[in-house]
From Swiss-Prot:
UniProt: S-adenosyl-L-methionine binding residues: 113, 133-138
NCBIfam families in the record: PRK00026.1, trmD
Catalytic reaction equation(s): guanosine(37) in tRNA + S-adenosyl-L-methionine = N(1)-methylguanosine(37) in tRNA + S-adenosyl-L-homocysteine + H(+)
Protein name listed in UniProt: tRNA (guanine-N(1)-)-methyltransferase
UniProt family annotation: Belongs to the RNA methyltransferase TrmD family.
Entry keyword Transmembrane: no
A cellular-component GO term for this protein: cytosol
Amino acid sequence: MWIGLISIFPDMFRAVMDYGVTGRAVKKGLLQVHCWNPRAFSHNRHQTVDDRPYGGGPGMLLMMQPLRDAIHEAKNHTETGVKVIYLSPQGRKLDQQGVYELAANKKLILICGRYKGIDERLITTEIDEEWSIGDYVLSGGELAAMILIDSMTRLIPGALSHESSAVEDSFAQGLLDCPHYTRPEVLYGIKVPPVLLSGHHANIRRWRLKQSLGRTWLRRPELLNNLYLTHEQVRLLKEFQYEYNNLIESQV
């Protein structure tokens, strides 16, 4: 996968290129990350990239010209077919389905805004899509870009040590993940669920699915509205709800 980044703080992305899953993907040649700083494309000696917005008001805007030239330079370093993404509070909210869609492009240029945003003329002429990582305010698009890069990298074949991890993660199947445990078997008086120690793979699979369904029902019930549950999933969810309600009643 090829990713071009347009950012006035390119050094922030060393964390992506040097560490964790994304860092390993870069070392394996599965992920290429290149940065272009709009300041290098400014037409004045102060390398100015921002200015006051027309109409007044607080804050500054990133100017169109340095960003536009940086985008065009990034496009010159890859083949055709690259999609330009602006990380923006006004964009479509990112979810796992959106990650799948974006990762399918293979080549992306990510625009990291700053200040109050960017000149609208750049959005209308150069941006293919706007994406948001949530309904909250950040100081810039760099962190949003890192989140997007990390989530997409997990879908690249060979990026994870265990390919099944990407399938079993929360949201990969539209559900939250089930609880997980590691050694020791008993810690501070808390025991690992016996089914996980049984070695019975079918029972373990059913337990994990039931816990995943139940956790989603408890914490993010709206996610279930978007899913078509199988007969097995409906049965397991009802079992979880029955057991949960009995537990609550016993504690009253």
